[in-house]
Amino acid sequence: MKEFNWPVRVYYEDTDAGGVVFYANYLKFFERARTEMLRSVGFEQDNLLAEQNLIFVVRSVKVDYLKPARFNELLDVSAKVIEHKKTNFTFEQSIIRQQNVLCTAEIRIACLDAQSMKPKLIPSAILEHLN
């Protein structure tokens, strides 16, 4: 799959006392883009849990904060699978405001059995859509 993009508006609740986006909230923006990426190819995470006892969890995160985002700005959040193995994906993600890169991340997502919390094979149907 090509790079997926999702618009995010910065709300007051996303900012800190200095009026800039609180650093942890960038992770929420990245999460929304990955969720919407899955949704765009027909996979709802609640259905994956109910039907296949499958969940996705963050395994590791590497983030570089380059420039601040501020209240009421419209941002573009991207997500692209750059590597996949049998039980995990690695996403390359960025947050951009008018061609200015504000934040980049490499996020590894593991596929787990929801009950045992042990690694589970990523369904082939998902891999077909995200590669």
Residue positions per predicted region:
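Hydrophobic beta-strand-centered segment that forms part of the acyl-chain substrate-binding groove
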Residues: 38-76, 80-89, 109-110
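Hot-dog-fold acyl-thioester-processing enzymes
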Residues: 2-58, 114-131
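HotDog/MaoC-like acyl-thioester-processing domains
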Residues: 4, 39, 70-72, 82-131
